[in-house]
Design a protein with these regions (language model features):
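C-terminal helical cap(s) of enzyme catalytic domains, especially alpha/beta-barrels
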Residues: 59-68, 202-216, 258, 270-295
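Extended, intrinsically disordered, low-complexity segments
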Residues: 224, 279, 283-317
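Glycine-rich phosphate-binding active-site loops on the catalytic face of alpha/beta enzymes
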Residues: 48-53, 128-134, 190-200, 247-248, ...
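N-terminal capping/small domains of soluble enzymes
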Residues: 1-100, 106
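Hydrophobic faces of well-ordered beta-strands that scaffold small-molecule active sites
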Residues: 17-21, 44-48, 100-104, 128-130, ...
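Glycine-rich beta-to-alpha transition loops that act as phosphate-gripper elements at the mouths
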Residues: 103-106, 169-175, 224, 240-252
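Glycine/Thr-rich beta-alpha phosphate-binding loop at enzyme active sites
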Residues: 71-72, 134-148, 179-240
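Catalytic cores of alpha/beta
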Residues: 29-35, 112-122, 173-186, 236-238, ...
Length: 317
């Protein structure tokens, strides 16, 4: 019998399948499906959509463009801001039957510190994800594209909380392992990747940009090969757990990410096509592991790396 249970940064999870931030609206899903959602929640942990210090309206429409193998989004992180999240969303998310990971993004170290301080305090929050894809207003640099900026940010927020800090990495860099290593040096407990790839779409009639913001981020099956490559590179570069994501739509594809060194996998774009994707991927992953003779996800972890899994399996999750 294959046991899917994993320990992630000291948080026990029933299985390694979680959601990508902003791809599954648990509050809306509960309104639609009622308490049945709580009885059969599709993920072992829930990652909130990214919140910012102040409310954001998001980008102008149009915001989505479907591609033959995925989609380009330019949502722009619309959210209620920190106070609105704590007052209105957190009480509802706190009722979910799984650990809650809250994603935050600031424009400066001071904003990140305020967000971490506010989000880490409530007992409902198990861990925080730092979205480092926004330009720093002080340096003009995108934090997650610069190892030194990433390390500096982690050093600034690490003393604020003992709860796990996960750094969400951008794929739009030449050496993701260097950024991940800097995050680890700064005190990160885990990293997650990949975020979306920079992309654009043109209106076939006008030959002008279709998206209201001009460009956006590509996700879905089109990015899966890139994601696996970067997960492997990062898993080989750090000793902290890796959450792998990017175009996962089946258990076999989830297993590829585990073999690439991921401790957890996240389902993202597939949730828009199939709201029950998390549960299905989990079932299929269990069967894939059983069929191949693995007794747990850990037994498959890192098998594709140059020195298979022995190093990864010895690491604490």
């Amino acid at each position: 019998m294959t046991n899917l249970a994993v320990d992630f940064c000291g948080i026990p999870l029933e299985h390694p399948v979680i959601n990508g931030s902003g791809t599954f609206d648990a509050i809306a899903a509960r309104r639609a499906f009622g308490d049945e959602l709580l009885r059969s929640f599709p993920f072992s942990a829930f990652v909130s959509k990214t919140i910012t210090l102040e409310p954001r309206a998001g980008n102008p429409p149009p915001r989505l463009w479907e591609t033959p193998a995925g989609m380009i989004n330019s949502i722009g992180l619309p959210n209620k801001g920190l106070d609105g999240f704590l007052e209105r969303d957190l009480p509802l998310l706190g009722e979910l039957p799984v650990p809650l990971i809250v994603s935050v993004m600031g424009r400066s170290q001071d904003e990140f510190k305020a967000l971490v301080r506010g989000v880490a305090a409530p007992p409902e929050v198990a861990a925080l994800e730092l979205n480092v894809s926004c330009p720093n207003v002080e340096s003009g640099l995108i934090v997650g594209e610069q190892p030194a900026e990433t390390r500096s940010l982690l050093e600034a927020v690490r003393p604020i909380t003992e709860k796990p800090l996960i750094v969400k990495l951008t794929p739009n860099v030449a050496e993701p392992g260097a950024v991940a290593g800097a995050a680890e040096e700064g005190g990160a407990d885990a990293v997650s990747l990949i975020n979306t790839l920079k992309a654009a779409a043109l209106d076939p009639a006008s030959l002008r940009p279709w998206l209201g913001a001009g460009s956006g981020g590509l996700s879905g099956p089109a990015v899966r090969a890139v994601a696996i490559h970067q997960v492997r590179a990062v898993a080989a570069a750090v000793s902290i757990p890796v959450i792998g994501m990017g175009g996962i739509g089946s258990g076999a594809e989830a297993l590829d990410f585990l073999a690439g060194g991921a401790a957890l996998v996240a389902v993202g774009t597939e949730n828009f096509r199939d709201p029950a994707a998390g549960s299905r991927v989990c079932r299929e992953l269990r069967e894939e592991l059983r069929r191949r003779g693995f007794g747990s996800p850990a037994e498959a972890r890192g098998l594709s790396l140059p020195e298979p899994a022995l190093n990864l399996r010895s690491r604490s999750s």
